A protein has these predicted regions:
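Non-catalytic terminal/accessory segments
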Residues: 1-187
């Protein structure tokens, strides 16, 4: 928690008081614990802040992760292009952010569960079913329900229903598979 308070002064307050007033376009900072994304309207502003950010972090004994720190365009795609995974897609806090078309043909930012995170959740549920298959069905159901609901409570954002359903179906298949293996009799 002390790191969060420290980063609040090093990054959040600095960005609002020092950086934003000097920018030509709009900018927005989103931070959770030690992960953050800064969105800029103008590329020139982004490059200037990137330089200043490295200096600011070094001044306070911090450094940015080289592989995670990058500049890339995340503009609305041109009218003729379809959305989906592209150079402007990025991962943040377990989500993949991308552009998609709405029902009315407009562009909107969308979130979906990061592929690796969804795979890890499915594997964790399968491991649980395998290692707890000796427990009563009622106890297994309660535990699986907690796990699936926990995942959906975090990743259940608008536009991510398909991945939530995938996890539920994977949990059902895994549970059924391991229940059938409890004895020689098929259930």
């Amino acid at each position: 928690i002390l790191g969060n308070v420290y980063l609040h002064h090093v990054l959040d307050v600095w960005f609002e008081r020092e950086v934003k007033p000097r920018l030509k376009g709009h900018a927005h900072l989103v931070r959770y614990a030690d992960d953050f994304v800064i969105g800029f309207e103008l590329e020139h502003d982004a490059r200037r802040v990137m330089e200043a950010l490295h200096k600011r972090m070094a001044k306070h004994g911090l450094r940015l992760h080289a592989e995670k720190t990058r500049l890339f365009p995340f503009n609305k795609p041109p009218p003729g292009q379809s959305g989906g995974k592209g150079p402007g897609t990025f991962d943040f806090l377990g989500f993949t952010l991308y552009w998609r078309r709405t029902r009315w043909g407009n562009w909107a930012q969308n979130f979906r569960t990061r592929t690796a995170r969804l795979r890890r959740s499915k594997q964790a549920i399968d491991d649980y079913c395998r290692s707890h298959r000796h427990e009563s069905v009622k106890a297994q159901h309660a535990a699986l329900r907690r796990r699936v609901h926990g995942h959906i409570n975090y990743f259940g954002v608008n536009g991510n229903v398909r991945n939530a359903r995938r996890l539920v179906r994977a949990a059902e298949r895994s549970w059924h598979k391991w229940l059938r293996r409890r004895s020689n009799r098929a259930r």
